[in-house]
Amino acid sequence: MILKELYDFLDSNKEVKGVTTDSRFIKEGYIFLPKHGKNFLGNEFFVEAITKGAIAVVYDEYIPNLVVPLIVVDDLDKELKRLLNLIYQKPFENLKLIGVTGTDGKTSVSTISAYLLNHISKAANIGTNGIFYNNQIYDNLFTTPILCENYRLF
């Protein structure tokens, strides 16, 4: 997908390879959509994201002098959902989820469950030890990955 397909007012044929809300996950060709946090606004991460290869920034206020296109939107959450579904083609549409909660044994139960389910279908396991999917192991920065990473992986 190219940038001008997502934003027809931009005259850019740059390929969009992903979107993320966390500058630590930016890769070449990504759109950066920082969300406001408890202790930060998100705009303090623009330079890092652009340096790492962000091809555009989506934000809810105008910030002057960016070297990449800035798309100003009213609702960051709504725009994030739109971008995730367009870029990653709705990966969760037919997904079934199983959650494991409790004090002890969550990792064991989820690992064994994913192992057994992989014999009859395609299963993934997200937890403390990483993300296991398609015979690959992905490290995760957080026990519960950010939404963009879930879309990217699945």
Predicted regions mapped to residue ranges:
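N-terminal leader/targeting and accessory segments in enzymes
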Residues: 1-82, 86
